[in-house]
Amino acid sequence: MGNVLAASSPPAGPPPPPTPSLVGLPPPPPSPPGFTLPPLGGGLGTGSSTGRGSERTPGAAASGAAAASEDGSCGCLPNPGTFEECHRKCKELFPVQMEGVKLTVNKGLSNRFQVTHTVALGTIGESNYHFGVTYVGTKQLSPTEAFPVLVGDMDNSGSLNAQVIHQLSPGLRSKMAIQTQQSKFVNWQVDGEYRGSDFTAAVTLGNPDVLVGSGILVAHYLQSITPCLALGGELVYHRRPGEEGTVMSLAGKYTLNNWLATVTLGQAGMHATYYHKASDQLQVGVEFEASTRMQDTSASFGYQLDLPKANFLFKGSVNSNWIVGATLEKKLPPLPLTLSLCAFLNHRKNKFLCGFGLTIG
């Protein structure tokens, strides 16, 4: 839901995905160990004291369907999660590209406050330094959730990304995000999300300007129809001088046993994903994207291999453009170190990128 801020400027760079969601603020720095940084659209968690329905997961869907069949009632439907999270389960399996050398140092100053230092050196992109701050408040909703959450990140040029997330009531969560480019104020947005027992509704307002008459409004709604099926939609309205438009898309999510299938269909194209948990160690995903604007389609396959006893995590992917990628993360106990290796090969363009990362803390 937070992908609306860049719609006020013409698109640049590679073609956007076929979903009507627009590009938003860069993601905040990762939360430190022991800290909780829930996204605005994140689930309230099964351990939450909110009393709302828990978000549907592949494992929970099977048990929910079995329980419904036993008592013959369909009245207790699970919360379907949020619209923007429909494809997240599959996308998390794909490796993230990293080029050059990256060093990250996490330092906890207290149980609720941490700072992060990140240095990135690259041969293609510019080298940079980022300073991040994470604060978790005292409003404890569950053993893993506390509010408010404040996150800030500033680079060596003075550009700032900041977010504030707060749980206003058991079902209502809000977020405010701002972005500056050096000394210039660039973007800001306000989000509100309400979670019912079997539905989720959310609204985002980005870059409103009453004097100029411009802004972006995004509305999401996702409703559980059965313990396994959820349907919903997204409406994006944008306005600026001399231009006004609306984009609408529909989504469906089906969760059963250990797999999850999701499809989003709209004016911009179609986006479909399939997630399958083969075992506790292996997860696989397939993604298909079709863009009506770019007249282009692509398909991707990704998998994740997790070996907790060996402190080993591997992700690999290949797509229809013949781009092969892989990342490897290896924790080095008893030291608080995590080693990361990344490699991507584009067979069509004959290009190869690799990266090395080290996280301390």
UniProtKB/Swiss-Prot annotation:
Membrane topology: Multi-pass membrane protein
Localization terms from the record: Mitochondrion outer membrane
Protein's job: Channel-forming protein essential for import of protein precursors into mitochondria. Plays a role in the assembly of the mitochondrial membrane respiratory chain NADH dehydrogenase (Complex I) by forming a complex with BCAP31 and mediating the translocation of Complex I components from the cytosol to the mitochondria.
Residues that span the membrane, as ranges: none
Main location class: mitochondrion
Molecular function, one GO term: protein transmembrane transporter activity
InterPro entries: Porin_dom_sf, Porin_Euk/Tom40, Tom40
UniProt protein name: Mitochondrial import receptor subunit TOM40 homolog
Keyword Translocase found: no
UniProt feature, compositional bias: Pro residues: 11-36
Record region (Disordered): 1-73
Regions of compositional bias (Gly residues) in chain numbering: 40-50
